[in-house]
Amino acid sequence: DMYYFRLQELVRKEICRDLPSVVSISMSNLERAQKYFMMVAESAPLRPKSIDVTRKINMLRQQSDSLLRFFHDMRLIYYSADQLGTTPAKQKVFMGDTNLLISFFGDKENRQLMCETYFLSQMRSVANVEFMVNGDFLIGGKYIFAVGDPLRGYDRLRFVPDAYAAIYGLPKSVFNRMPAWILGFSY
């Protein structure tokens, strides 16, 4: 599709144009930055392993951390800032929105990842979003959201105060479960 090709081209141009204005970077490192972005896109929702980054594009962890911050500031990706201290294998990194996810990742069939990416793109515009250890999301330090599959068990949230489930494919809200699309009205 031409739209997604154009979006990829636009992102590559932005990286080439904006990154040198923020940090002094050589042309070879600029190419590595683009390759690293592609690695991040392909490994979403997990951060690429440091050993893979070192082997494939010869980049140190400090460099990859600073590039992650840059991509986050450009809103190309989203990660929770409190995760940078943890090991990279456990860090979650999502694409900035579903258009970027489809454009670079290409997997429209991974509905769980699509739903989580959509959820993040909607909620981070109105509140701080943190990732919880169990895979849920903490919104604004108060609300807990489980995001995803309608067949997944959400009974664990039933008696937890301020806990909700954003579910794709759900036609209407029932108790603390809501359709994921309704979050589009959050801003």
Report each predicted region and the residues it spans.
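Active-site-adjacent loop/helix micro-motif of nuclease/hydrolase catalytic cores
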Residues: F105, N110-M114, P150-F159, S173-F175
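Conserved catalytic cores of phosphodiester-cleaving nucleases, focusing on short active-site segments
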Residues: M123, G135-G153
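Structural alpha-beta junctions
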Residues: V126-N128, F159-Y164
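Domain-level recognition of nuclease-like catalytic cores that cleave nucleotide substrates
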Residues: P171-Y187
